[in-house]
């Protein structure tokens, strides 16, 4: 190897000096002066932004929520057991983001989209901000496609459309989660991506939902996001936004999605806990003043996108728990005013054996009727009115000793129509099966049967139609209308099966 001359070395060093560009990196550091209950107060951090991610010495992340004159109030995204007074904190210059992608399907993740199902890491290339702006007016189109729940009471009288926000509200133990899970099960084979967000629930309850979905092959198109009751309130507060972010990835690729928030009462309680610990002024029921914005910015992300954006959709089914049926409490009234309708579940109906325990009289869907398929409109047009009149007559008949024949007939018809709405859990029905059941009831074919025989008869009729008259189902599925041909096929099938059912009963 030849020796370099001093001139060559000098020129080489000069060249390197000329190429060198000094890189000055400023990092904003702060010092923790108080920590506890998932909250840290920090001196310094003069340039921190609201909602910015902070990184503590031990690797724990936090979010800056309170920017005060002398300190910053931050919530911790973890237990923070190793954070002490005097620990250093640095700004990251980022807001909270999570990875998103196809590989999340069939997985169970926490509020930061980290897998918790023991199936290993989730590989993905894309990320999205947890707090994303909702689509604007120009980015949306009106709801026009149905999202079938598989429940006769909902699809016939409180129809839901893709891109709608429909509240499920009721007391504890009235079947709110059951309706949500049935809706997920009914999306099988329809290309809808489902996200189930469990907020502040027992791990055993989430495991039950997971098993229901797994047994029926619904986990393949579902993501479960969980922030259990034993997790920090920060994670319970973030979980719904994480669920919405995961669903948004699929929505913006032009696919229909369904997001269930179970339940937003617990998220509001977690946010109240955080706000009180941050010493924000309490308002009604000790909730902070921005608790309405907490839910509105979440639910406004549900939309039916315009053609230009790929016509994807996110349908939101938020769940809210009431106390003793009181829908005038703060959180229920807030969410009712944000959503496009509500399915109200009654404890009295549940205890009377009417399940799903939907109170059809006060449940409403504000935009879903535009999305209801024509076949259902044709057969279920008068169903809600008939049931409302029946409920009124039933209450009146308790005080009347003798009733005329017309009233007795109306009461008999009403009690049979109510049987049509009863459905066992995890047994969603297809549209053609629902249409057949409603048509049978509204046209008086069930009047000759005992009330207790109605459900066995309808179950048998559905099997009879599938095995012996498959062309009826094909017509309704393909045309989405109840054509004269479909009606004549159904009439004949009902008449034939009535005779068969009567013969079986007499034997």
Swiss-Prot record:
Residue(s) at site: Required for activity: 363
One GO cellular component term: chloroplast thylakoid membrane
GO molecular function: ADP binding; ATP binding; proton-transporting ATP synthase activity, rotational mechanism
Compartments reported by the entry: Plastid, Chloroplast thylakoid membrane
Main location: plastid
Catalysed conversion reaction: ATP + H2O + 4 H(+)(in) = ADP + phosphate + 5 H(+)(out)
Binding residues annotated for ATP, in chain numbering: 170-177
Top-rank lineage group of the source organism: Eukaryota
E.C. no: 7.1.2.2
Membrane-topology descriptor: Peripheral membrane protein
Keyword terms: ATP synthesis, ATP-binding, CF(1), Chloroplast, Hydrogen ion transport, Ion transport, Membrane, Nucleotide-binding, Plastid, Thylakoid, Translocase, Transport
Record-linked Pfam families: ATP-synt_ab, ATP-synt_ab_C, ATP-synt_ab_N
Annotated SUPFAM superfamilies: C-terminal domain of alpha and beta subunits of F1 ATP synthase, N-terminal domain of alpha and beta subunits of F1 ATP synthase, P-loop containing nucleoside triphosphate hydrolases
Role this protein plays: Produces ATP from ADP in the presence of a proton gradient across the membrane. The alpha chain is a regulatory subunit.
Matches recorded under PANTHER family: ATP SYNTHASE SUBUNIT ALPHA, MITOCHONDRIAL (PTHR48082:SF2)
Family recorded in the similarity comment: Belongs to the ATPase alpha/beta chains family.
Subunit structure: F-type ATPases have 2 components, CF(1) - the catalytic core - and CF(0) - the membrane proton channel. CF(1) has five subunits: alpha(3), beta(3), gamma(1), delta(1), epsilon(1). CF(0) has four main subunits: a, b, b' and c.
Protein name, UniProt field: ATP synthase subunit alpha, chloroplastic
